[in-house]
Amino acid sequence: MKGKCNIAKVLCLVLTFSVSLVCLADTALSAEPVNLTVGYQPYDTISYSAAVINARELWKKNLPPGSKVTFEGALQGSIIVNAMVADKQQIGYLGDMPAVVSTTKTRIAPIKLVANTGLSAGQRCNVIMVRSDAPDFKTPEEAVKWLNGKTFATPKGSCADRFLRTFVEKTGVKPKEVLNQSLEVIATNFRVHKIDAAVLWEPTVSRIGELVGEGVAKIAATGYTFNTPDAGFIAMRADFVEKHPDIAKAWLKTELDAQQFILDPNNWKEVAEIVKGQTTGISPAMAWFSIFGAVPDNCGGAPERDTKPFIFTPEVHDLITGTYIFLHSVKVIDVDKAPEGAIDDTLARQVVAEANAPTPLGVIIPKDVSQSPF
């Protein structure tokens, strides 16, 4: 009789423990509905996962039933940073420079970087383009010589701005002037030959370039040539994470699903069509090439187009640390390291562990343009 009682107690404990696990796993789904506003850049490959989440409504799987998510598109990250600081957006998809800058607004609104959306060898945002009638350079180093004394343009405060500053410092190139121009103005000025060069990011590079685009500019070099990687991040307001850790984690579960979707070659055509549907002027062929196409070797192409670490690996940490130091040295920010608690992938690591997913999640090996499905 006593043995039966002990068995009953054990079974009761096991059942209680199992129910507890189910309850913990289902915390977000059992919570009250939420209204989220997400800032993303459909004109940037670091936000393609957000575009997938938006199009396929993946967030419905993890957020409480009845929740609503509003996606607000922006042409560059600084716009998203301003919206997050003003508490108009809780979540933002950012390139490396605006991501780092966002964390320095501690007196107004502390912002955390909570996950990585992509890490490339300078293939995404660190791209130097030259006007269409520039010489056909045999190597990026040859292009560097031509670029000295030329007129550059880039959107100030962007990840491309960071690379241009780094490029000038590393090569000693002295631009005639550096113009602060939007993506559209740069494209227009390339058409009428008002600028010699620009530093831009994908998919605008593919849109105006000679490989699948309009042909008003040519890729001359990338960050791969100068050992300067680029990355994308998910930023969240610190007060949002503190008040709603379950919702923040639920969003990262959704992000994991989206990144895994992008990594599957069977989905590449659909990803391109999704991006086309959330942009203007970007064709499916341009969207496909911007993340899955191979940049030629002679202008800085790398063996890997993009890596999806998701968490902050040593390589991601190195990029973050270097970005703080560099932006402080050129007086863009007033600190040379991350504020306490600003770089926090705790929830991302939990999500990866619970999904039993590898880190990195995967790598995109680019295909030649001739293999495009479009």
Feature locations, PLM:
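Conserved C-terminal helix/tail region of periplasmic/extracytoplasmic solute-binding proteins
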Residues: L319-F374
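Basic/polar N-terminal segments that are highly enriched at the extreme N-terminus
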Residues: M1-K2, A25-S30
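Pocket-lining segment of extracytoplasmic ligand-binding domains
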Residues: D161, K176-L179, L183-P284
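Charged, glycine/proline-rich intrinsically disordered loops and linkers
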Residues: D133-V144, F292-K308, G362-P373
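Bacterial N-terminal signal peptides that target proteins for export
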Residues: K2-V14
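Secondary-structure end/capping motifs
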Residues: K243-V335
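Bacterial N-terminal signal peptides
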Residues: L11-C23
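Short, glycine-/small- and polar/acidic-enriched structural segments
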Residues: L29-S182, N189, D196-E202, K218-T222, ...
